């Protein structure tokens, strides 16, 4: 599955997003964004750029974090993007495989994309 991906590490007040053209091919390094209309619109702009470059509609991938991830999932589904919600246990397994144990939101955004490309999970139902 070589589709473009916007991976998001969701946190309480702000989250981090990284964009990939395909597995291992980064388009945008992990950057923070606020949970505001302006912050979300900047991510939609990134998704539009990904689609223009690749000719494929990107998917949004994030970890299930309950109250924090639900509004983000709804936002992207309303914008007609497929959203893949990963089980946190899946991404935790990826962290355990890493040689260096690093817990930072930017690195987590990359790991979320890695789990997506390795496991090919199906998009969540709207």
Q: Which residues does each PLM region occupy?
A:
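Phosphate- and other anionic-substrate recognition elements at nucleic-acid/protein interfaces
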Residues: 1-126
């Amino acid at each position: 599955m070589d589709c473009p991906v916007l991976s998001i590490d969701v946190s309480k007040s702000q989250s981090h997003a990284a964009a990939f053209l395909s597995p291992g091919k980064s388009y945008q390094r992990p950057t923070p964004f606020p949970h505001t209309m302006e912050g979300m619109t900047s991510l939609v702009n990134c998704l539009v750029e990904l689609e223009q470059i690749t000719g494929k509609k990107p998917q949004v991938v994030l970890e299930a974090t309950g109250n924090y991830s639900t509004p983000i999932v709804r936002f992207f589904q309303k914008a007609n993007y497929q959203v893949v919600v990963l089980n946190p246990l899946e991404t935790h397994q990826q962290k355990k495989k890493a040689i260096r144990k690093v817990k930072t939101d930017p690195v987590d955004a990359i790991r979320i994309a890695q789990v997506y490309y390795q496991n090919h999970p199906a998009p969540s139902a709207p």
